[in-house]
């Protein structure tokens, strides 16, 4: 076997690997934050924003990533918003991943008993402290397997970015 061909293209593979890693890491971190925010809004039923969060989750989960990327890359420039292909890929991954992470967080939040919340309030914690120190750690522990599945899913979805001018992938 002639390994000189592999040697010749190795720098391109390295560049593609690090680009994929860069987009995936930022996309996963952004998805985690968006998912937490959206799930808290839905769980605590914040008026108007709860319905908006539900619409976001349904729209994001029920449209393919490729369609979302085409909208970001080809649709937004028609209204004057031009983003680089890397930014489009990252935003698209955050948009998609945020909805999946939100559902994971929501399942974790619903798994925590209401009694835990009441006990936190009874010992003098503020509602935010109850959420931060009592509810969130338990919800995160329950949702951890789902988070890892979502991370794997998001890394696999980076292969779609080659359709939107990320030819390095």
Where are these regions (language model features)?
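Transmembrane alpha-helices and adjacent helix-loop boundaries
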Residues: 1-168
């Amino acid at each position: 076997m002639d390994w000189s061909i592999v040697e010749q293209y190795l720098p391109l593979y390295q560049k593609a690997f690090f680009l994929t890693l860069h987009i995936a890491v930022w996309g996963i971190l952004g998805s985690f934050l968006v998912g937490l925010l959206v799930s808290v809004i839905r769980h605590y039923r914040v008026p108007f924003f709860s319905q908006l969060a539900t619409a976001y989750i349904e729209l994001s989960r029920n449209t393919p990533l490729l369609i979302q990327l085409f909208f970001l890359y080809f649709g937004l420039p028609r209204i004057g918003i031009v983003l680089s292909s890397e930014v489009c890929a990252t935003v698209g991954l955050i948009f998609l991943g945020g909805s999946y992470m939100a559902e994971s967080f929501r399942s974790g939040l619903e798994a925590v008993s209401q009694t835990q919340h009441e006990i936190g309030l009874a010992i003098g914690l503020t509602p935010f402290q109850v959420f931060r120190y009592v509810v969130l750690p338990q919800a995160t522990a329950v949702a951890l397997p789902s988070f890892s599945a979502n991370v794997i899913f998001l890394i696999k979805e980076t292969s779609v970015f080659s359709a939107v001018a990320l030819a390095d992938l």
